[in-house]
């Protein structure tokens, strides 16, 4: 699904509210047929594993003190779905899925270009194979040639793993590339 609109019309706020990075002020949010607008903390943890986000600016969304490997492994560790020995294997698998060279595993975000940083952000978002991913302007900060690579990666992951995206953008050409449903928003 694509959400398109001018700057300031609330596209990113909608995405952040859906995944509980921001509190809602009105209305309800349903996920898997259940109102998740005001859920208890324990239930929110389970929901958060099923809903992730890929941010517009991969540099500011990645912990500068963590290596590529640590960033991608973090959700695996927090979830307690994997044993310690499995986390390393799963991290390597995810890095390969998103096209991050194994030699970059010990690199820090500032050592990577924008496209590689965004691949790390995507790797972190898909680590637990969530049902729903908000992609908040994930290619707007990238060069045009890199944009196509990242969009193709997102499409490939969507086809292979049945991921559902809410693609937030102001660029119709980007959303046409990735989305079959389109919602527009007008700031006025």
Where are these regions (language model features)?
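Conserved ABC transporter NBD signature motif
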Residues: 27-35
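Conserved ABC ATPase signature
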Residues: 108-112, 116
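A short, proline-enriched helix->beta-strand linker immediately N-terminal to the Walker B motif
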Residues: 127-131
